[in-house]
From Swiss-Prot:
Gene3D superfamilies: 3.40.1380.10, ATP synthase, gamma subunit, helix hairpin domain
Protein known as: ATP synthase gamma chain
HAMAP family named in the record: ATP_synth_gamma_bact (MF_00815)
CDD domains referenced in this protein's UniProt entry, alphabetically: F1-ATPase_gamma
Membrane topology type: Peripheral membrane protein
Keyword presence, Ribonucleoprotein: no
Signal peptide from the UniProt entry: none
A molecular function (GO) term: ATP binding
Keyword list, A-Z: ATP synthesis, Cell membrane, CF(1), Hydrogen ion transport, Ion transport, Membrane, Transport
PANTHER family: ATP SYNTHASE GAMMA CHAIN, ATP SYNTHASE SUBUNIT GAMMA, MITOCHONDRIAL
Similarity comment: family membership: Belongs to the ATPase gamma chain family.
Length: 314
């Protein structure tokens, strides 16, 4: 009985330590979530304005005869190349996951839904080019034999434009060199602190579908949209302005996806750690009850034995 009591006591102490760790991790994740949400609200205003300008100019450019394929000898990607459709031989998959675990179903949801997308669109190991942001996705696709052409690990808790520029530069360069002919971005979209939803967004080539998805994402910032109607005269030219703004738009698409995914990651981590803390608390209560009952039984047994001994002596 003494050993049993010691075992239960040991489990109680161990569970209390786990409870302290998960509670601390929950507070850290909640703090990160609050911090990144401030950046998200600022980004939405910026993204809405950029999208409004680019949407007007690019849609006109898409309908014009000048939207041909860029010169393949150029080392930089042009506006026409970003907008022009071409035969699809390879499909790029930019998959955003976390670098670590302890985030609930966050990673498994992204990977499962991405695999479903691949099956639906007939994308397999032969024609898929994976670009992984986050170690979990990179390791998963390497293990499953897919071509992981690029991976970026260690994204900040609050991602910066500097990080995104490096990713966008690599992605557009690969697109320019025809490593893939279209690019989709896959990530978890933050809905609220308790839930998130999977997103699959076509990034390249930039099309009307891209603008429609971007407009939907930036609904909350619609009051700050810039009205760029035909009454505005563009200087020096629409092409020059589009050349300057379109790369920023591509950056904002990727930055928005990573920011959204990170927000969902912190929310998922906070929720998972809260559930773990609650479960640990429940287990501690059950173990305390078990310990007290075992201790009470041991005391009762000892009293019974003492009483029996006294009676025997009489």
């Amino acid at each position: 009985m003494a050993e049993s009591l010691m075992d239960v006591k040991r489990r109680i102490d161990s569970t209390k330590k786990t409870h302290q760790i998960t509670s601390a991790m929950q507070m850290v994740s909640t703090s990160k979530l609050n911090q990144i949400q401030k950046h998200t609200s600022t980004y939405q205003v910026y993204a809405s304005k950029v999208e409004s300008i680019v949407s007007h100019l690019a849609k006109a450019h898409l309908m014009s005869a000048s939207a041909g394929v860029a010169n393949s000898n150029s080392n930089t990607i042009s506006v026409s190349e970003l907008l022009a459709q071409r035969p699809v031989k390879k499909t790029g998959l930019l998959v955003i996951t976390s670098d670590r675990g302890l985030v609930g179903s966050y990673n498994s949801n992204v990977l499962k839904q991405t695999n479903d997308f691949m099956r639906t669109h007939k994308v397999d190991a032969d024609n898929a080019v994976v670009l992984a942001v986050g170690g979990t996705g990179a390791d998963f696709y390497k293990k499953n034999g897919l071509n992981v052409a690029y991976e970026y690990r260690g994204v900040s808790d609050v991602p910066t434009f500097k990080e995104v520029r490096e990713i966008v530069k690599t992605v557009t360069s690969m697109y320019h060199n025809e490593v893939f002919d279209e690019l989709y971005v896959f990530y978890n979209h933050f809905i609220n602190r308790l839930s998130s939803g999977f997103r699959a967004v076509k990034m390249l080539p930039i099309s009307e579908e891209t603008f429609e998805q971007s407009e939907s994402d930036n609904r909350k910032a619609k009051d700050s949209r810039v009205d760029v109607g035909p009454e505005y005269e563009m200087e020096p030219s629409e092409e020059a302005i589009l050349s300057a703004v379109l790369p920023q738009y591509a950056e904002s698409l990727v930055y928005g996806a990573i920011l959204d995914a990170k927000t969902a990651e912190h929310a998922s981590s906070s929720t998972a750690m809260k559930a773990a803390s609650d479960n640990a608390g429940d287990l501690i209560d059950k173990l305390n009850l078990k310990y007290n009952r075992a201790r009470q039984a041991a005391i009762t047994t000892e009293i019974t034995e003492i009483t029996g001994g006294l009676v025997a002596q009489e």
